[in-house]
From Swiss-Prot:
General function of this protein: Suggested to be involved in cell wall modification.
SMART domains (alphabetical): G5 (SM01208)
Gene Ontology molecular function terms on file: hydrolase activity, hydrolyzing O-glycosyl compounds
GO biological process, one term: peptidoglycan turnover
Pfam families: 3D, DUF348, G5
Secretion signal, residue range per the UniProt entry: 1-31
Species, as recorded: Bacillus subtilis (strain 168)
Induction behaviour: Negatively regulated by an overlapping cis-acting antisense RNA which itself is positively regulated by extracytoplasmic sigma factors SigM and SigX; when both sigma factors are deleted expression of the yabE mRNA is detected.
G5 domain boundaries: 206-286
Entry keyword set: Signal
Originating gene: yabE
UniProt protein name: Putative cell wall shaping protein YabE
Length: 407
């Protein structure tokens, strides 16, 4: 009985020892397994942690962390790199971004931090005039939408001055607003404001319209009125009242295109100053006339009797008028009369072959005079009567008159 108990006890010890040995072996194996792991620092999308791993490569490590990678992801070092002790592994997941350029959309995956970095990464060439939304310094986020409207050049002819301007505007109206161009309602824009602008079809012509009022002052000619004067010898005239020109203001609406006048319309007239008639007294007194002639010195006077009038020769001649200051005139007659010093002298120019110089005559509508001058254009039955004023000479004009030679 004692022997049997000993045997049983021995078996229990054996089992206990075996169990202890098994536990010891397992612990040793576990310890050995843990001791063979590599210590690695992993940064996942900016979050760092330290792990121990049996992974052979960086790719294996990411798989053990249940990270599904894409070609666009940023992994440092590369996935095929062997794991070493105290290795730093950085993983940045690419984000999906929708990029639209000039209306064409495509989806990209990128680890770029900002819009500008993404465009550089994708080799998208942009100009400072391009419209980029959001701005290039905006941080990239998942499913972000980026829109780029490339700028193009518009040729603007503004009042004849041409310049090229970069823009992303799609219509003429939007372009003018974007450029803050001062356009008046009267200005002409070509093409129309709602016309589309596209690359290669972007020419704008601006015609500047200006409306101004132009006031022009004109002279109003005075009338000449003659009145009979019984106290004045017949054939003589005397200025009773000098004429004075009036002033007329004409208001014109002037339209200019690019500074050049294209139309003018009279909109108003107003008299600024009334004209004043010239009044001439015409003698009607019947008496023996005195004829004043001037010698070559321009000073002496001669009195001629009217008795020759009844026997004088009457002729019909063409007549014109002149003054002392007419073109080509010296102020002195062919017989030496100084007309400038004797403005009231009654003198006519004649053809000496028809009417001798020095003859006393009576000219219809002019009165008594002396044939004291000649002229290169005075040939045959033609005379030129002298007036001290141009206005009187102009009024005489060119007419046919009767002349009586008194001596």
């Amino acid at each position: 009985m004692k022997k049997l108990f000993s045997v049983k006890l021995s078996k229990s010890k054996v089992i206990l020892v075996a169990a202890c040995l098994l536990l010891a072996g397992s612990g040793t194996a576990y310890a050995a397994h843990e001791l063979t792991k590599q210590s690695v620092s992993v940064s996942i999308n900016g979050k760092k942690k330290h792990i121990r791993t049996h992974a052979n490569t960086v790719g294996d490590l990411l798989e053990t962390l249940d990270i599904k990678t894409r070609d666009e992801d940023k992994i440092t070092p590369a996935k095929q790199t062997k794991i070493t002790a105290d290795m730093d592994v950085v993983y940045e997941a690419a984000k999906p971004v929708k990029l639209t350029i000039n209306g064409e959309e495509k989806t990209l995956w990128s680890t770029a931090k900002t819009v500008g970095a993404l465009l550089d990464e994708q080799d998208v060439d942009v100009k400072e005039q391009d419209q980029i939304d959001p701005a290039i310094d905006t941080d990239i986020s998942k499913d972000m939408k980026i829109n780029i409207e490339p700028a193009f050049q518009v040729t603007v002819n503004d009042a004849g001055k041409q310049k090229k301007i970069w823009t992303t505007s799609t219509t003429v109206a939007d372009f003018l607003k974007q450029q803050k161009m001062n356009i008046k309602d009267e200005d002409k824009i070509k093409p129309a404001l709602d016309a589309k602008l596209t690359k290669g079809k972007a020419d704008i012509t601006i015609t500047r319209i200006e409306k101004v009022t132009d006031v022009v002052e004109e002279k109003i000619a005075f009338d000449v009125k003659k009145q009979e004067d019984a106290s004045l010898e017949k054939g003589k005239e005397k200025v009773v009242q000098k004429g004075k020109e009036g002033k007329l203001k004409k208001h014109f609406e002037v339209v200019k295109e690019n500074g050049k006048e294209v139309s003018r319309e009279l909109v108003k007239e107003e008299t600024a100053e009334q004209s004043k008639d010239k009044v001439i007294a015409v003698g009607t007194k019947q008496s023996s006339p005195k004829f004043e002639t001037v010698s070559a010195s321009g000073d002496s006077k001669t009195v001629v009797s009217r008795s020759n009038e009844s026997t004088g020769k009457v002729m019909t001649v063409s007549s014109t008028a002149y003054t002392a200051s007419c073109s080509g005139c010296s102020g002195h007659t062919a017989t030496g009369v100084n007309l400038k010093n004797n403005p009231n002298a009654k003198v006519i120019a004649v053809d000496p072959n028809v009417i001798p110089l020095g003859s006393k005559v009576h000219v219809e509508g002019y009165g008594y005079a002396i044939a004291a001058d000649t002229g290169s254009a005075i040939k045959g039955n033609k005379i030129d009567v002298f007036f001290p004023e141009k206005s009187s000479a102009y009024r005489w004009g060119n007419k046919t008159v009767k002349i009586k030679i008194l001596n």
